[in-house]
Amino acid sequence: MTTFAAKADVKHAIAPSPLQTFVSTGAESIAGSSHLPNEISLARQILHNLQYQHYWSDLHVHTHSPTTHEPLPRPLLSGLPPLRLYVHPDEQVELLKKADRERKARAEGAVAGLEVKAEPEREWILPTRLNEKWTLRGLAEVFDAITMAPPAPDSSSTEGTRPSNPWRTTKRVLLASVDTDSTVVYYIVHDGVVKPRQN
């Protein structure tokens, strides 16, 4: 005797990915924000990429300007990269001179290479989508709303707005551009003219 069981056409629920859960819960957690949920989700997506793909630390989403406390044109991130992203050309010369002096001061049996150390510094990150059209006016609005360096996460006063690096003389953001396939490309954008690098 043969029996056949009829299988019901049941669709099983698919659990959301950890990234999807991270991005969607973050958008809900920023209450009182005047930004659209897709802007918050984009910022959270970039935050996730920086934290887990590029090993940044101390990442925060900012919805209000640290200077005027008005809403930012769009949510920004701030964080600490594992290595310095940008070294001013004059600072690079000073770091090389310092490393050379330290190398000469070492004993003869020590390693002869130069050890150039540039400490990482907090950076602003501007989350964007690749298909967005940015104008100079739009970038100027962002630069007008931010400080030279992002404030330290635990400081509510303006003492954290001054850069600890004397070579940091212009505002800069890391423009994070996300494509439709979730790849992220990063560009350093300065406010104003910057001395060119010499290789």
Give the predicted meaning of each segment.
Residues 1-16, 40, 188, 195-198:
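Nuclease-adjacent, charged terminal/linker segments that flank catalytic cores
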Residues 12-170, 181:
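Acidic, polar low-complexity intrinsically disordered regions
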Residues 157-191, 196-199:
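Helix-rich interaction surfaces within compact, conserved domain-sized segments
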